[in-house]
């Protein structure tokens, strides 16, 4: 069983390398037309150049998974701001794409919790489609839209989970088919359990990104031993390994909050279930210390008898 690892957005070991530098609409409005463009394009260029630095860092450390920052282009989906964030930066998008393709990196996006398809308010669905389209356009500009995924949560329950799930199935029809084809769903820590999310994924033919921490915070009746093979099966039509999210609780009191690093004892039960399933899969680490948490976990896991480190962020068990 091969396990490959990655992390989210910021490389903590790199100095001044945020790929998510911002520009607020308030500050944008205060500027003249030319100043707006100059400032906004400067921030975007920084974010893209920092992303390139991070990719080089990942390549050097043999980290095969990476989640791009959704904030890479500030104000991209703001209704009162229109600008070309693709054509102007074509050379940088292509440079990012070339690195990803040459080194066979697995790239993903994870829009925020407001991108959902369970609402009864049409503008929420419209905004979700706008946001999904923005993420897809970036993947397309990079040249990896057909091999990369945009991960979201199912959404809210709004007091009636069954009705909300019905709305999800109805609202998701409004998402263009080529974008839906590149989306995944994740179980959450309060509302939609693993089994509920799995059922939706199976019905919509959407790959399921299983989050173990969320699962432990929002347990369902079915044991993980039964669920995991079915979860991994949702990826069978993609020719890509299943992906899971790993983090651990900050404390017993703040169980849902992410700790700085991964608690090996917390994730061991999941790893043993995965080992019984004996299917290759990828792991996205969602700890606060990101790449540093990844390195620590790799060191701890590779010290376990039977687990062999075969590259910087890849283990065989």
Curated annotation (Swiss-Prot):
TM region positions: none
Listed GO MF terms: endonuclease activity
One BP annotation, GO: nucleotide-excision repair
Enzyme Commission numbers on file: 3.-.-.-
The keyword Transmembrane helix is annotated on this UniProt entry: no
Name of the top EC class for this enzyme: hydrolase
Classification via Pfam families: UvdE
Keyword DNA-binding: no
Keywords on record: DNA damage, DNA excision, DNA repair, Endonuclease, Hydrolase, Nuclease
Task performed by this protein: Component in a DNA repair pathway. Removal of UV LIGHT damaged nucleotides. Recognizes pyrimidine dimers and cleave a phosphodiester bond immediately 5' to the lesion.
Family: Belongs to the uve1/UvsE family.
PANTHER family reported for this sequence: UV-DAMAGE ENDONUCLEASE (PTHR31290:SF5)
Protein name according to UniProt: UV DNA damage endonuclease
Native organism: Bacillus cereus (strain G9842)
Upper classification of the organism: Bacteria, Bacillati, Bacillota, Bacilli, Bacillales
């Amino acid at each position: 069983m091969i396990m490959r690892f990655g992390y989210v957005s910021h490389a903590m070991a790199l100095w001044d390398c945020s790929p998510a530098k911002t520009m607020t609409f308030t500050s944008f409005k205060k500027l003249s037309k030319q100043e707006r463009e100059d400032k906004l394009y400067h921030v975007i260029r920084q974010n893209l150049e920092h992303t390139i630095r991070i990719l080089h860092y990942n390549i050097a450390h043999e980290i095969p998974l990476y989640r791009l920052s959704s904030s890479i282009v500030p104000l991209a989906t703001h209704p009162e701001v229109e600008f070309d964030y693709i054509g102007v930066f074509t050379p940088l998008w292509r440079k990012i794409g070339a690195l990803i393709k040459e080194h066979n990196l697995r790239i993903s996006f994870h829009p925020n919790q407001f991108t959902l398809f369970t609402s009864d308010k049409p503008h929420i669905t419209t905004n979700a489609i706008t946001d999904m389209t923005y993420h897809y356009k970036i993947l397309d500009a990079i040249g990896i839209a057909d091999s990369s995924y945009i991960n979201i949560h199912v959404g809210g329950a709004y007091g009636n989970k069954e009705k909300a799930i019905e709305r999800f199935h109805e609202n998701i029809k409004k998402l263009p088919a080529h974008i839906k084809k590149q989306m995944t769903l994740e179980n959450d820590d309060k509302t939609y359990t693993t089994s509920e999310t799995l059922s939706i994924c199976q019905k919509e033919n959407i790959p399921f990104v299983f989050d173990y921490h969320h699962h432990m915070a929002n347990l369902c009746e079915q044991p993980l031993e039964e669920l995991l093979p079915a979860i991994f099966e949702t990826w069978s039509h993609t020719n890509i390994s299943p992906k899971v999210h790993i983090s651990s609780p900050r404390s017993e009191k703040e169980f849902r909050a992410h700790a700085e690093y991964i608690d090996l004892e917390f994730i061991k039960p999941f790893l043993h279930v995965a080992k019984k399933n004996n299917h290759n899969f990828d792991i996205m680490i969602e700890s606060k210390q990101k790449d540093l948490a990844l390195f620590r976990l790799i060191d701890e896991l590779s010290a376990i008898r039977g687990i062999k480190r075969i590259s910087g962020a890849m283990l065989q068990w």
